[in-house]
């Protein structure tokens, strides 16, 4: 029984593991394989140029995938941040037209299509993105490849109402009428030769005289709007096989001859613009896919929508530009130069229109074949070759030529028309210059006619064409560069410099020569365009081959990695199976061991129960004994507690009595302390009174000493005055004596001189020979002393009290240890202390003695102003007096002597 349960459990585990493995295959590996298949199909398609995107496996790949752009671009999002180049102006314009047209087509498709219930299913990333981008299109898998669909015939079922409207609209072909009588219409496979034969059978219809854009009425085109031409095997072929020659309404028989009938399975009439309703008349017959599912996928694919809407927008814009150009050419009659240019442009259009009926079928087939090879061809070549003149309706009447004579016959232009014509001329010139690439533009000699040496006839001022300013500067720069590039060897002696000044008067030119030049220029442009296209195609093919090689290498590496992963998974599965087998064996052994353990445990538990019962009885007896012991212990404990409480009560009473005794002692101590403090206060008060008395006595003694010192000073002053008076009297007496002595000496000298004069006179009168002179009795010997004493001025007594105030003192100070003069008595000792006390207690009023001294103004002293003059320094004004406390500190610092 246990073996059967284990076997059933093992089968359940295996079934669950198998289901998980199948679910993993369906949810992961099959999705990977589908994605690889989609990427491979994209790689081998002609318009694939993106990198293959697979589902991310690691977090880094997921983050990298967030930074990439989507595989299917958002058609409703306008690009931003792109630089607009002059060379790419037409391509950017076509891109913007394509985006706007696709938006409108998406809105139309959302209104016209019927919503079908979508079933939940597993989708790859590309399908999910396609369903997000086109929510109205029902996502259906393509069971067959495009090559298989192309080999099948298509059967399309239509309603009776559609059939009747088609019979009314498209009558004229017996074979097609017989096909329309049946509800099921087989559409055979059509080769390219058949397409070329159908195109060759197209006859250009007559065109009315007025070249205007036709407007088809609503009621006539509504029935025909339901008819859709079957798409090609691929969306690229269906998008490229479009004929742009038919723009005007044509008869029903021509439409029947041109278009074989092929109807879709849509039952809703699409509501769109008139150009959308006329799309039936602008298409060729191609093969329809085999089923409704593939028809929807090819009909509503983004590539076919994008190409069809691009062509429609380009066609509409070219119709508008050509209509504006024609209206401007008809209304404008400017100068002969502008009319000549307009006639050249119109002749170009006429020649292209004339050539169109013969070359249209072959060109359309060749252009379609070329477009299938390279679907992303530039819009400039399309507009230049295929679309530029196809909007002009054909006519059986002779073409209307606008020549120089017809323009000359027009009326005189008004200023407004002249300005309009000039603006149109400039715009057309700029457009022509932009449409030509650098290597396609004709040279200066090809663009301008040969000049004549004869002077041109005068032209009225109103018809003079002045080149625009940028052309003047451009031509001037070109001529200057040519002159700079010339070498001295390349210029001959007799060669004259070519003038770069352009003549404003128009020059006559042969129309045949001009036509030949125009055809040559057109041929050169076509050749250059073909070469450029070939180079572009070669570059694209080379890049596509390189991309394919890279993708193949990348896919090969991915497949190798997948194989390695699968091998690792297989090994892991084998290991898991082995582990499961080992686990089963171990579980069997464990189960047997568990059964034996359970039996042993049962025996052990029985023994344990008996032991527990015995132990319980013993514990019950022990508990009873313990309860008795606890009661006795509790009783003893209560007795002890009672005794303890009594002892604590006695102890508490003792503590209270002790506390009372301590409180009384503390109170007595506080009382004694208070008395001691009162005694100390009284002693302090007595000492303070004694100190005040002593201070008063000291003050009185100091006052008496000061009075005594003042009296002594007064006495000294009087003594000094008396001494000065005595000295002055003595000095005056000495001066008087000296003056008398001088007067006596002067008188004696005068008398001596008189006597000498008399003796000389007597000697002169008497003979002097043999006369003996007695020197001793001579009065000359007694006239003066032989060694007179030197005169000594009386010495002035030095006042010892006047220290350092004489003229002999210099700026240097004395040394304290060795003064040059004796220190006076009033500068030391008791006299100094008395002077300080007197100045301290009775300071003199300096302001009353010397008057108020104003603070010096340093600006007036030095005749200038400096910031330091206003700072509190020794050389500046002190705005605030020194603190009064400093004065007290100075006085106390000397230490008064008592």
Curated annotation (Swiss-Prot):
Biased composition (Basic residues): 60-69
Gene Ontology molecular-function annotations: protein kinase binding
Keywords assigned by UniProt, alphabetized: Cell cycle, Cell division, Centromere, Chromosome, Chromosome partition, Cytoplasm, Cytoskeleton, Kinetochore, Microtubule, Mitosis, Nucleus, Phosphoprotein
Biased composition (Basic and acidic residues): 367-376, 431-449, 564-600, 607-677, 707-759
Pfam family name, one: INCENP_ARK-bind
GO CC annotations, alphabetized: chromosome; chromosome passenger complex; cytoplasm; kinetochore; microtubule; midbody; nucleus; spindle
Comp. bias regions, Polar residues: 259-272
InterPro entries: INCENP_N (IPR022006), Inner_centromere_prot_ARK-bd (IPR005635)
Regions of compositional bias (Pro residues) in chain numbering: 455-470
Modified residues (Phosphoserine): 874-875
Bias (Low complexity) ranges: 90-99
Region of interest (SAH), residue spans: 512-730
Ranges where the record places region Disordered: 50-127, 251-282, 358-379, 406-470, 525-548, 564-677, 707-770, 802-824
Subunit structure, as described in the record: Component of the CPC at least composed of survivin/birc5, incenp, cdca8/borealin and/or cdca9/dasra-A, and aurkb/aurora-B. Interacts (via C-terminus) with aurkb (via N-terminus and kinase domain). Interacts (via N-terminus) with birc5.1, birc5.2, cdca8 and cdca9. Interacts with mtus1.
Domain notes: The IN box mediates interaction with aurkb/aurora-B. The SAH (single alpha-helix) region is characterized by a high content of charged residues which are predicted to stabilize the alpha-helical structure by ionic bonds. It can refold after extension suggesting an in vivo force-dependent function. The isolated SAH domain is monomeric.
Family: Belongs to the INCENP family.
Function: Component of the chromosomal passenger complex (CPC), a complex that acts as a key regulator of mitosis. The CPC complex has essential functions at the centromere in ensuring correct chromosome alignment and segregation and is required for chromatin-induced microtubule stabilization and spindle assembly. Acts as a scaffold regulating CPC localization and activity.
UniProt protein name: Inner centromere protein
Gene: incenp
């Amino acid at each position: 029984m246990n073996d059967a349960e284990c076997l059933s459990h093992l089968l359940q585990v295996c079934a669950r593991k198998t289901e998980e493995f199948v679910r993993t295959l369906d949810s992961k590996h099959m999705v990977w394989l589908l994605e690889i298949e989609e990427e491979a199909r994209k790689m081998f398609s002609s318009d694939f140029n993106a990198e293959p995107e697979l589902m991310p496996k690691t977090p880094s790949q997921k983050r990298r995938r967030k930074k990439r752009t989507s595989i299917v671009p958002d058609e409703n999002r306008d690009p931003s941040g792109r630089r607009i180049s002059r060379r790419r102006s037409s391509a950017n314009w076509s891109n913007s037209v394509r985006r706007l047209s696709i938006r409108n087509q998406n809105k139309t498709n959302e209104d016209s299509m019927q919503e079908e219930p979508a079933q939940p299913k597993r989708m790859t990333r590309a399908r999910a993105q396609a369903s997000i981008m086109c929510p109205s299109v029902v996502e259906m898998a393509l069971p067959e490849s495009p090559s298989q669909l192309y080999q099948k015939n298509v059967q399309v079922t239509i309603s009776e109402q559609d059939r009747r409207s088609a019979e009314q609209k498209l009558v004229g072909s017996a074979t097609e009428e017989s096909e329309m009588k049946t509800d099921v219409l087989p559409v055979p496979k059509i080769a390219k030769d058949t397409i070329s034969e159908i195109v060759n059978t197209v006859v250009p219809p007559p065109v009315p005289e007025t070249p205007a854009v036709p407007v088809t009425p609503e009621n006539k085109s509504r029935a025909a709007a339901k008819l859709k031409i079957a798409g090609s095997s691929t969306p690229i072929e269906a998008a490229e096989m479009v004929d742009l020659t038919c723009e005007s309404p044509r008869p029903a028989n021509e439409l029947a001859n041109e278009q074989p009938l092929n109807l879709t399975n849509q039952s809703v009439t699409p509501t769109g613009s008139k150009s959308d309703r006329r799309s039936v008349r602008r298409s060729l017959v191609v093969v329809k896919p085999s089923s409704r599912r593939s028809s929807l996928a090819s009909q509503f694919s983004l590539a076919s929508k994008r190409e069809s809407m691009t062509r429609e927008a380009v066609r509409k814009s070219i119709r508008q530009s050509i209509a504006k150009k024609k209206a401007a050419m008809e209304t404008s009659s400017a100068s002969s130069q502008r009319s000549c240019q307009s006639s050249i442009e119109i002749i170009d259009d006429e020649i292209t229109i004339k050539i169109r009926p013969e070359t249209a079928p072959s060109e359309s087939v060749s252009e379609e074949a070329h477009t299938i090879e390279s679907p992303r061809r530039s819009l400039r070549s399309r507009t230049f070759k295929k679309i530029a003149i196809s909007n002009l309706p054909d006519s059986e009447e002779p073409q209307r030529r606008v020549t120089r004579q017809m323009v000359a016959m027009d009326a005189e232009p008004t200023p407004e028309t002249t300005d309009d014509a000039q603006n149109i001329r400039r715009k057309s010139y700029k457009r022509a210059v932009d449409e030509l690439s650098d290597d396609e533009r004709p040279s200066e000699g090809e663009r301008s006619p040969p000049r004549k040496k004869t002077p041109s006839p005068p032209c009225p001022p109103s018809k003079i064409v002045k080149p625009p300013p940028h052309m003047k500067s451009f031509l001037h720069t070109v001529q200057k560069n040519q002159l700079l590039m010339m070498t001295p060897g390349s210029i001959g002696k007799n060669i004259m410099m070519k003038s770069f000044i352009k003549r404003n008067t128009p020059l006559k030119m042969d129309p045949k020569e001009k036509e030949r030049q125009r055809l040559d220029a057109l041929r050169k442009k076509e050749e250059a365009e073909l070469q450029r296209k070939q180079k572009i195609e070669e570059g694209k093919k080379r890049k596509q081959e390189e991309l394919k090689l890279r993708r193949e290498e990348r896919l090969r590496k991915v497949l190798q990695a997948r194989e390695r992963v699968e091998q690792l998974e297989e090994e892991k599965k084998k290991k898991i199976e082995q582990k499961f087998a080992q686990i089963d064996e171990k579980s069997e052994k464990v189960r047997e061991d568990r059964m034996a353990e359970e039996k042993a445990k049962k025996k052990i538990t029985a023994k344990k129960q008996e032991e527990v019962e015995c132990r319980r009885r013993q514990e019950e007896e022990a508990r009873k004994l313990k309860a008795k012991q606890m009661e006795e212990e509790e009783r003893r404990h209560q007795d002890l507690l009672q005794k303890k409480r009594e002892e604590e009560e006695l102890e508490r009473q003792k503590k209270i009595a002790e506390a009372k005794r301590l409180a009384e002692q503390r109170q007595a101590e506080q009382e004694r302390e208070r008395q001691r403090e009162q005694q100390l206060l009284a002693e302090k008060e007595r000492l303070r009174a004694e100190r005040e008395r002593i201070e008063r006595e000291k003050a009185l003694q100091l006052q008496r000493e000061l009075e005594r010192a003042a009296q002594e000073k007064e006495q000294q002053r009087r003594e000094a005055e008396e001494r000065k008076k005595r000295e002055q009297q003595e000095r005056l007496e000495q001066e008087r004596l000296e003056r008398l002595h001088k007067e006596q000496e002067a008188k004696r000298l005068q008398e001596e001189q008189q006597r000498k004069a008399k003796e000389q006179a007597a000697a002169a009168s008497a003979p002097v020979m043999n006369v003996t002179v007695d020197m001793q009795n001579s009065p000359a010997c007694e006239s003066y002393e032989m060694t007179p004493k030197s005169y000594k001025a009386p010495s002035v007594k030095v006042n010892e009290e006047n220290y350092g105030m004489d003229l002999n003192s210099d700026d240097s100070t004395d040394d304290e240890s060795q003064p040059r003069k004796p220190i006076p008595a009033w500068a030391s000792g008791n006299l100094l202390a008395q002077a300080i006390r007197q100045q301290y207690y009775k300071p003199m009023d300096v302001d009353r003695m010397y008057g108020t001294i104003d603070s010096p103004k340093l600006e007036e002293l030095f005749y200038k102003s400096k910031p330091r003059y206003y700072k509190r320094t020794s050389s500046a004004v002190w705005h605030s007096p020194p603190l009064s406390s400093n004065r007290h500190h100075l006085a106390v610092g000397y230490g008064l002597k008592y």
